[in-house]
Amino acid sequence: MKMSVNNILQDKRRWTTFQLIAFRISFVFFIIISIPNNPLWYKHVFAIDWLNLDYRDLYDICRFGSGVNWFGRTTFGHHLQGYSIWVNTLFFSVAAGVLWTAFLKLRKRERYEYDKLFYWLNVIVRYRAGLGIIGFGFTKLFPVQMPYPSLGILDTDYGDLTAQKIFWLSFGIVPWYQVFAGILEVGAGTLLFFRKTVPIGAALLVGALGAIVVVNFAYDGGVHVYSSYFVLLSLFLLIPYYRPFYDLFVREIPAKVSLYLPEFNPAFHYFSVGLKAAALFIFVGVFSYLQYIDFRYDPYKQPSSAGVQELRGQYNVTEFKLNGETRPFNPYDTIRWQSATFEKWSTLTFRINKPLRLDLSNGGGDPKRDVNRTFELSGVAGGQRAFHYYADTDNQMLYLEDKYKLFPDPRNVTAGEGGDRGVRNYLTDRTLNDESPAISLEEWMPDSVRHKFADEVNDVHPKARTTRRIREFAKADELAKKETRKRFVVNYAVYDNGNKVILRGVDENRDSLYVVLDRVVKDYKLAPGKLVAGQYD
């Protein structure tokens, strides 16, 4: 297949009326879906500390909401599986295209072609698709998007996992496959920066992201709209290549691609080359380093704080007392713990035979506080509970708070509006009274102890102490005072070289609690490899 570039005034051809109207509609549509529709995005860009970047700073530049949302997020009352904003944008674009055509006819200023405008529209779509998929791909290239299953998840029956969770865990157990997918996405995005490699990059995105769309529909994955977004942009970029591809691969005859390229003066040419080089340096070079730091020290779906070393592992609950009353093992007991796990990070999970509200998120978003990172809880049923804990190792005390939230954090929103700073887990007029915690925040952790954990923002490797993390914690600490969480406190004692753990304390209902845990070693047929996120030793 041969590619030729036509300069201004060369090989000018007259577009058909259909092509002119279709372009006007397409121009409005793709411009709208290629630029941020939320003022908070622009506020975020100007607030970035470029001397102390967090990976999420660049990620939020690459990922943003777009489209016409002035009429809400429904079309005639229907969400359309999340595509309603696209449909509303299309309606708006059709109306704008018709008005554009009518205006030109009234002014008798008919155009015969839009070669130059089509060129610049392609540039905008190329860079939008390229930057977006690079941000998306780095979370796979350094595998943090789909973590390896935690001990609590491994202790969960297969039937108690949602379809989405099963799919994500299927990726999580093969991190090198995630890496391959990340290389594909980042590589395809990089190819879109260069005009001659656009068809390769766009074709790769159609194939890779098209498969992700199908899988997300099959497993209720939740990112089908965003994946479809890149498929749509890539299909648009391939428009000049459809006929040549057909000639080459179907008719098996020589094919020629004719692309329009305006003539630029030398100054503009050097400026554009410099701009492209800067974009590649920041969004490929710097971004890859920042994503590695996140993978190595602060994976965004896993807590960053290390758990108590001597507690880590899986346990059978051999003795359980509530208010001094022994509750023998009974699989139908709705109060007694059935099993328990201490993760390598600061999370305790245990199972009870009681239906609980299910967290249907994918555990993502951008929270910096460990208690708001819920991947080990999201999509997990079977009475599984997960508690983040603060460990006072001097006095062997654990201060635990429930990781489940009535209102999950909004996903994929601009910094400061989601994750920790957008916590909506507050008491409201609509919140049921019986959801109020029996132990208040002040009772749970008195001031005499709280000062030991006041420096939580720095409880991470120095390279991960970004300005964004500091800002998020500053606001999150204030909002945490309004949260509605179940909390309890226990003293822990370790015996028999760590094979037995005894917990004594008060649970979230102010009942005295006494639990004896015996360590158990389970022979799973899979084991984590060397490519493991986080640093917990």
Residue ranges of predicted features:
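Hydrophobic alpha-helical transmembrane segments in integral membrane proteins
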Residues: 139, 284-312
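Cytosolic-side transmembrane helix boundary signature
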Residues: 106-107, 111, 239-279
